[in-house]
A protein has these predicted regions:
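Glycine-rich, aromatic-lined ligand/substrate-binding cores of catalytic
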Residues: 176-190, 202-220
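Extracytoplasmic "Venus flytrap"/periplasmic binding protein-like
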Residues: 2-61, 66, 98, 212-213
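Short helix-initiation/N-cap motifs at beta->coil->alpha
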Residues: 2-11, 111-117, 194-207
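Periplasmic solute-binding protein
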Residues: 37-40, 61-106, 144-166
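Glycine-centered hinge/linker elements that transmit conformational signals in sensory
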Residues: 119-122, 151, 157-198
Length: 223
């Protein structure tokens, strides 16, 4: 059951500390459920009879969140919110046609879709509509988004990796990541191809045919 974060977490920790074995399975949010590991409230799933090599388990996620050869959380087909919150890139078909741009579907199928193409498309469409040099929500944008922090992941540049013992370490500081951030900086700050607004404003701009691309969780497709 869910009332609020603190009540939810206190219910779990109180049950574990009391040894009453009320809960055997917990569905929680990554941002806070992970703290239960440091409180010794979770069981190592690798010590169970569960076969995590089955197709319905997401090996990429489960391998990444394991610690020192132990697994305390697992993600699989039953985790519907994973799909709902998966970051995707929507594109506006009307603007694609109006500007005579090749569909991203075609470019993906021919292995020609990359960030440089997205950047070129976005910069072609972006326009300071009222010529006030303000570049705000009244203009037309090549791309609107909310979470810039997702960009490094798109370039397969992980924030964190693990050594041979399974110990995680920060892997942010690399020449490749510096190149990624330089590209993103130019795209976002210099070229005005992309802008970050609040989710509601992004949705409005995109629905009004004033954004070519829209980065958002998949669940926004239902809006």
């Amino acid at each position: 059951t869910w009332a609020d974060k603190d009540s939810f977490m206190n219910t779990i920790t109180s049950s574990v500390l009391a040894g009453d074995d009320t809960y055997q399975l917990i569905a929680g949010y990554n941002a806070y459920i992970t703290t239960l590991v440091t409180q010794d409230c979770l069981y190592n799933l690798y010590d169970t009879a569960i076969d995590f090599t089955k197709d319905w388990w997401y090996a990429g996620y489960n391998d990444n969140v394991s610690l020192f050869g132990k697994l305390y959380f697992a993600l699989g087909d039953a985790s519907l919110t994973m799909w709902e919150n998966c970051e995707v890139l929507f594109f506006n078909k009307n603007l694609m046609e109006n500007y005579g741009l090749t569909s991203p579907y075609t470019l993906v199928d021919t292995d020609k879709w990359d960030f440089d193409t997205l950047r070129a498309y976005a910069n072609e469409v972006s326009a300071d509509v009222n010529n006030d040099s303000a570049w705000d929500e009244t203009d037309t944008w090549g791309m609107v988004m909310y979470n810039k922090r997702d960009f490094p992941v798109y370039f397969e540049n992980p924030f964190c990796q693990k050594d041979e013992s399974g110990k995680p370490y920060i892997s942010l500081f690399s020449e490749r990541l510096a190149d990624v951030y330089e590209k993103v900086y130019q795209f976002y700050q210099v070229e005005h191809g992309c802008h970050q607004f609040q989710p509601d404003m992004n949705q409005q701009i995109f629905s009004e045919d004033r954004a070519l691309f829209y980065q958002a969780p998949l669940r926004y497709a239902a809006l």
